[in-house]
Amino acid sequence: LIYSDPRDDGYAAGAVMPNGPMRPRDGVQRGSVEDMPLYPGDPLTPGVGATKDAKRLAVADAKTITKIPVLPISYGDAQPLLDAMGGPLAPEDWRGALPITYRLGAGPAKVHLKVKSTWTLKPLYDVIATIPGTTEPNEWVIRGNHHDAWVNGAEDPIAGLVPELEEARALGELLEQGWKPRRTIIYAMWDGEEPGLLGSTEWAETHADELRTKGVAYLNSDTNDRGYLFLEGSHVLEKFINGVARDIEDPETHLSAWKRDQQAEIAQGTADQRKDARDRADLRIGALGSGSDFTPFLQHLGVP
């Protein structure tokens, strides 16, 4: 049983819905328990695209499907279960904000867990638009953002999807005016990101041989927010990104995005970070981990 404690994102962190953004008593966290560090994407087709005719594993043989049944619950439902636990006191940094004494167990509480899962296969729908390049058509620049969401998706993914659609609209206007790109540009809206990077991984696996030779760069967005420029990626793109950031004006301060980010680092960073921000001519790009649709391109196929 997984629950989000109010200490993390409930009433202890601020006003709860509908009076604020924090999780209410009956709110349940949504997320994936697929073992994505092992491999993301369709659990039944590791390493190959999940096309109609792809050979599939049996569910029992899929290594990324958890063998322990998992059910997320609200902290309202978790409270009586935790309150009934006995045993020694939990360490202080393990304790949450519920009005109970947090203990490690065991105790008299017994829980009967009944999980009903549907194992039917369902199609996912990636939306792909391609603008052929004129000079280097076999060099692909791919721009992606997922379109699926756990609920309504105002922040995740729509905050990233709307800018991507606006970019595509702008390029469409340029095409009508006679502009053509040097390299092939592929715009992608991925399905199934939330359950396990499904749409992007399966598309990348289907086109793996082409991407290894033609993939120049993959540009990903997901949950864009108001504020400062924040970038992570391959350091080979650091010089390019700094040039772009110098060309973009921040609408609030009318500084360049580069200058505003530098000032934020100087104002908010540690002593070492402030010195680094003053001394460096370029802003640093953070290293990528995983967790969004860039994963199959960077970690699996080596596309920056």
Annotate each language-model stretch with its function.
Residues 35-155, 169, 173-177, 277:
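Soluble metallo-hydrolase cores and metallopeptidase-like ectodomains found primarily
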Residues 5-9, 31-37, 101-103, 159-161, ...:
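Short C-terminal domain-edge/linker segments immediately following a structured domain
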Residues 23-89, 136, 190-304:
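Metal-dependent peptidase/peptidase-like ectodomains
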Residues 106, 177-183, 210-214, 259:
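Short helix-terminating capping/connector loops at secondary-structure junctions
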Residues 125-127, 139-175, 181-205, 217-221, ...:
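Extended, hydrophobic alpha-helical segments in both membrane/secreted and soluble proteins
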Residues 1-26, 134-140, 150, 165-175:
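A conserved hydrophobic secondary-structure block that centers on an alpha-helix together
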